[in-house]
C-alpha cells in the first residue's frame, strides 16, 4: 500500500479587492488567522512590503509552510499551502483565506506529496539516517 506524506494546495486567487492585498499590514493578519483556523503550528513568519504596493509572506509551520505573493494591480494572490499530517488542516486554512479574500475566481491544484512511498518501506536503523 502507498501512503502520502502531505497535501499541497497551490492556488491563484483572482479578483481580490486591492485594499485587502496591497500591504503586508493588511494581509498578514489574514494569513495568521488562516494558520489558526487550520489548526496549524506556526514556528515563525516573515512578511515583506513592496513599494508602492504588494506583499509577500511565508510562515514556517511544524507541518510545513504557507506562503503568498500579491499583485494588487491585478487583484491577484498566489498562494501555497503545504501540510503534513491531518490533510483537512490545509483545507481549513485554504477555505478561510477564500472566505475572507472573496476572490471572483480561483484556480487551484491539490496534490498529494510523497504519494509513491510504500507503507512498508521505512528506515529503522538510526545509523542509516546519518
Swiss-Prot record:
The modification Pyruvic acid (Ser) is found at residue 64. The keyword Membrane does not apply. Is synthesized initially as an inactive proenzyme. Formation of the active enzyme involves a self-maturation process in which the active site pyruvoyl group is generated from an internal serine residue via an autocatalytic post-translational modification. Two non-identical subunits are generated from the proenzyme in this reaction, and the pyruvate is formed at the N-terminus of the alpha chain, which is derived from the carboxyl end of the proenzyme. SUPFAM superfamilies: S-adenosylmethionine decarboxylase. GO terms for molecular function: adenosylmethionine decarboxylase activity. Transmembrane segments: none annotated. Binds 1 pyruvoyl group covalently per subunit. One of its GO terms (biological process) is spermidine biosynthetic process. GO terms for cellular component: cytosol. Its EC number is 4.1.1.50. Its cofactor is pyruvate. The record marks 63-64 as: Cleavage (non-hydrolytic). Keywords: Autocatalytic cleavage, Decarboxylase, Lyase, Polyamine biosynthesis, Pyruvate, S-adenosyl-L-methionine, Schiff base, Spermidine biosynthesis, Zymogen. Pathway: Amine and polyamine biosynthesis; S-adenosylmethioninamine biosynthesis; S-adenosylmethioninamine from S-adenosyl-L-methionine: step 1/1. The active site is at residues 64, 69, 84. It is an enzyme of class 4 (lyase). It comes from the Archaea. It holds the Pfam family AdoMet_dc. It catalyses: S-adenosyl-L-methionine + H(+) = S-adenosyl 3-(methylsulfanyl)propylamine + CO2. Belongs to the prokaryotic AdoMetDC family. Type 1 subfamily. Catalyzes the decarboxylation of S-adenosylmethionine to S-adenosylmethioninamine (dcAdoMet), the propylamine donor required for the synthesis of the polyamines spermine and spermidine from the diamine putrescine. Heterotetramer of two alpha and two beta chains arranged as a dimer of alpha/beta heterodimers. This is S-adenosylmethionine decarboxylase proenzyme. It comes from Picrophilus torridus (strain ATCC 700027 / DSM 9790 / JCM 10055 / NBRC 100828 / KAW 2/3).
